[in-house]
């Protein structure tokens, strides 16, 4: 009996000490997990900012004035982007020689 009581007390102290260490480890692991989550959250926010910036520059690039087609360039129809003094017209030889109309000065064909 004299040996059993100290062994039980020793096992009780070891168990309490192990639980205390486990709680400390849990807190440390939780802190590490939170810091990793914060780092990944910051990376995610940075990725969103870069994506928004890329979309903004894409809008800026697409907002420039569209280029027009010069003289004697084949065009599809009247809505083709010929330069202002030019119009998309069917010139002489259209159909049997030329396959499409051309951007020409108005009334020259």
UniProtKB/Swiss-Prot annotation:
Q: Which Pfam families match?
A: Toxin_22 (PF08092)
Q: Which UniProt keywords apply?
A: Cleavage on pair of basic residues, Disulfide bond, Ion channel impairing toxin, Knottin, Secreted, Signal, Toxin
Cystine pairs annotated here are: 68-83, 75-88, 82-103
Which ranges are cleaved off as propeptide? 19-67
Its domain of life?
Answer: Eukaryota
Q: Does the keyword Plastid apply?
A: no
Could you give one GO CC term from the UniProt record? extracellular region
The answer to whether UniProt assigns keyword Ribonucleoprotein to this entry is no
Q: GO MF annotations for this entry?
A: sodium channel inhibitor activity; toxin activity
Would you indicate the residue range of the signal peptide?
Answer: 1-18
The places in or outside the cell where this protein is found are: Secreted
About its domains, the entry says: The presence of a 'disulfide through disulfide knot' structurally defines this protein as a knottin.
Q: What family is reported?
A: Belongs to the neurotoxin 14 (magi-1) family. 07 (Jztx-56) subfamily.
* Protein's job: Probable ion channel inhibitor.
| The protein's name | U26-theraphotoxin-Cg1b
Which taxonomic lineage is given here? Eukaryota, Metazoa, Ecdysozoa, Arthropoda, Chelicerata
């Amino acid at each position: 009996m004299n040996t059993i009581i100290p062994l039980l007390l020793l096992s009780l102290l070891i168990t309490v000490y192990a639980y205390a260490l486990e709680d400390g480890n849990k807190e440390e692991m939780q802190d590490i997990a939170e810091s990793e989550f914060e780092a990944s959250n910051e990376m995610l926010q940075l990725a969103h900012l870069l994506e928004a910036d890329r979309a903004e520059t894409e809008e800026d690039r697409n907002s420039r004035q569209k280029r027009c087609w010069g003289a004697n360039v084949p065009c599809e129809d009247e809505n083709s982007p010929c330069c202002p003094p030019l119009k998309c017209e069917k010139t002489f030889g259209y159909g049997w020689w030329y396959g499409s109309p051309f951007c020409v000065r108005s009334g020259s064909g």
